[in-house]
Amino acid sequence: MTIADSLGEVGETAALARIFPRLPAASAQLLGPGDDSAVIAAPDGRFVVTTDMMIHGPDFRLAWSTPHDLGWKAAASNLSDIAAMGAVPSALVVAIAAPMDSPVTLLEGIADGLRDACEALAPGCGVVGGDLSVSSTLTIAVTAFGDLEGRAPVLRSGAQVGDVVTVAGVLGEAAAGLRLLFERATTDGEPDALLAGELRGEFKHLILAQLAPRPPIGHGVRAAVAGATAMLDLSDGLALDARRLAKASGVALDLDPTAVGSREALDGGEDHSLLATFPADAELPDGFRVIGRVVTGDGILVAGQPYDSAGGWDPYTGWNGAAG
């Protein structure tokens, strides 16, 4: 067997034998990969669970992302959802469907990205199981579990009039990176791997904000302990996600344009930062900064004026069907 063997040539068993050693173990794991199901400790008696899917085309382009990027982003996006509930990420289950002619090294790279993201963003979280299948389109689906450690979950429905609106993490950087890729890493309208590599060298911070984001995972627990009244992961853009929080809480969010910054910060997606509201007299945990206030009404305001831009990312309206 050579390092360039395809999945079709080696089969599932041999592919898994090469992937398993690369995956991180979970601290809460009582029984990991190899049986029909994993067994995970739940000291709190409850667990938080979320799932997210990445599909080649609408969610990523192989010409732009390395396999390591894909594994990292698949982990990071799910870890951020767990953090947004005020929980500690404990375990991931990963399902991958890939074309038959995909090299096994593709899956090894994805596994390495999953491992490195867990170790960097949520130490102690690991991959406890999953599935491999064949498909004409590369698809990565991750289910994440989290431990509330005895606390109540922080919902998106608890914001109160008078609260401050805060964010931990970046705003607009992932959108800026994506804009650069579309503007400068395509040839005849198709993603270009060589140009993307050059961009990665020139604008590394912004490109990685899009392809391999670093959400502030540990800040979710800090926010919960500090008394956050509502919280949510900014996966689809500040304006769109803030509107969701406002609707769930029955309030309006008035955002400060100076604190928010660029239009990309409002309308761009995939930063995976944490949007949280706190009582006005709360001591904000390190890493959170005020970007607005909770007021009566509904929807989103910017400097007191309604902000009606659709903005954000909706996979059913935002994808143009491009390949690459």
Give the residues covered by each predicted segment.
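Small-aliphatic-rich amphipathic alpha-helix that forms the alpha element of a beta-alpha
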Residues: P67-A91, D112-L121, G237-R244
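Short, acidic (Asp/Glu-rich) active-site segment that either coordinates a divalent metal cofactor
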Residues: V48-T51, P153-V221
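Extreme N-terminal cap/leader segments of soluble proteins
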Residues: M1-T66, V94, D112, D116-E119, ...
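Glycine-rich anion-binding loops of enzyme active sites
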Residues: P89-R184
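Beta-strand->loop->alpha-helix junctions that form or flank phosphate-binding loops
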Residues: Q29-G34, V39, D131-S133, S157, ...
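Active-site-proximal betaalpha loop/short-helix elements
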Residues: D101-P103, F203-E270
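Acidic, Ser/Thr/Pro-rich beta/coil linker or hinge segments at domain junctions
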Residues: T2-I3, L7, G11, R46, ...
